[in-house]
Amino acid sequence: MLCALLLLPSLLGATRASPTSGPQECAKGSTVWCQDLQTAARCGAVGYCQGAVWNKPTAKSLPCDVCQDIAAAAGNGLNPDATESDILALVMKTCEWLPSQESSAGCKWMVDAHSSAILSMLRGAPDSAPAQVCTALSLCEPLQRHLATLRPLSKEDTFEAVAPFMANGPLTFHPRQAPEGALCQDCVRQVSRLQEAVRSNLTLADLNIQEQCESLGPGLAVLCKNYLFQFFVPADQALRLLPPQELCRKGGFCEELGAPARLTQVVAMDGVPSLELGLPRKQSEMQMKAGVTCEVCMNVVQKLDHWLMSNSSELMITHALERVCSVMPASITKECIILVDTYSPSLVQLVAKITPEKVCKFIRLCGNRRRARAVHDAYAIVPSPEWDAENQGSFCNGCKRLLTVSSHNLESKSTKRDILVAFKGGCSILPLPYMIQCKHFVTQYEPVLIESLKDMMDPVAVCKKVGACHGPRTPLLGTDQCALGPSFWCRSQEAAKLCNAVQHCQKHVWKEMHLHAGEHA
């Protein structure tokens, strides 16, 4: 009895809204009445469809999203000067988003023929009016109808839907021997678990149905199961075809061997942090070749240490690093430039805190027995003459080095995976057939996209754009160590030469120092 009472209002509502007369097709019920505004008007069921079908959740698609946005803007009264003709023209414009000319023309005809019904719907509740209008014009499809009409994907669609990890195109990577890293291991473990379940005749959709859908109740559980079946079939097929390592490698969760060394922070002796370069270590000591040696490092750092006895602020160290190579002997000037260019971030942190010998040990140019080490070729980049001549700023070189490393990191498989995910996110607003084609396009053209990003990350251009590098400029008073005056100029012969103050120091400082020394003697 209770069930009958609950059913009675819906039956009465359907009877009241049902057409009393009309074509024979109207006798087929609401499935036919509510397919669009034209049919509903012909069957006299506009009111019923508006309240029972068109106000329900809709399937996501580009025409539907555009239509609902425009309908919401047209119906919210934000433009009080908009006439009814203006509103109808906006709604008619959305019909152009339909995929075929025939459906677009039919949509425009309905807007023109049933303008009063459309305006009436737009004046309704703001939260339901856009969906009602757009579903009535066939720009949106009710979600329940969309899921009910889905069919399993064909073999051709399945191949495209499983991209990128099933695509045999640009993302076919060389297999690695063993998974490494926490992310890779987690991926392999998860895929192995799913494959074991698949082997026991449980599909991936079944696993999710058991965990997710059963708790939703009988009404939503059917929609949930239908949805999962359609979208997990491609992944289920991939699980049956590929081993775990292959799936995770193709998905970008496992890196290839021989990834480029990266900068790592390590805890140094005496508790001083060292930005040590992640250079490849060998069991035997590197044979010394042309480049930066332990002796060059010691010479440069000792000179810096001597200059900075009274002022060892980070700014002063940075300025000293820019000038130190100009006072080095000509035989090691080139090596000095390489040293400063490669290790300046570490030197700035370390010079003020520890002895020169420890500095050179920290950056691995001096071993325990002070045997010579060579800087790895990948980092031994001599600054171009233009850079030295322009004096572009202390942060310029670091900025360019940072962007160069970032550009190289674009080759990382995990980075490529993240970029692909970002690009494919834009495909999600398209209807399913277009979404598959969009994702396939992104996968096919991934090398071109990555290369374009690398071109946009030109280190010199970007660093100039953000102001890290500037054109030639004369050092201002207070930004140069020579601006400290005689207390710095006359500290040593090298400092006097550096500041062009040899005569001044000889006449006013060193001469007086010799006189005082003679008096005390």
UniProtKB/Swiss-Prot annotation:
GO cellular component, one term: cytosol
Disulfide bonds: C64-C140, C67-C134, C95-C107, C184-C254, C187-C248, C213-C224, C294-C366, C297-C360, C325-C336, C396-C469, C399-C463, C427-C438
SMART domains per UniProt: SAPA, SapB
Keyword Glycoprotein annotated: yes
Segments forming domain Saposin A-type: 19-59, 475-515
Residues that span the membrane, as ranges: none
PROSITE patterns tied to this protein: SAP_A, SAP_B
Biological processes per GO annotation: adenylate cyclase-inhibiting G protein-coupled receptor signaling pathway; epithelial cell differentiation involved in prostate gland development; prostate gland growth; regulation of lipid metabolic process; sphingolipid metabolic process
Keyword Disulfide bond: yes
Location within or outside the cell: Secreted
Residues of the propeptide: 18-59, 146-180, 259-288, 370-391, 474-521
Predominant subcellular localization, coarse grouping: secreted
Domain of life: Eukaryota
Cleavable signal peptide: 1-17
Glycosylation sites: N201, N311
Keywords on record: Disulfide bond, Glycoprotein, Lipid metabolism, Repeat, Secreted, Signal, Sphingolipid metabolism
Ranges of residues in domain Saposin B-type: 60-144, 180-258, 290-370, 392-473
PANTHER family linked: PROACTIVATOR POLYPEPTIDE-LIKE 1, SAPOSIN-RELATED
Purpose of the protein: May activate the lysosomal degradation of sphingolipids.
Record protein name field: Proactivator polypeptide-like 1
Biological source species: Homo sapiens
Gene: PSAPL1
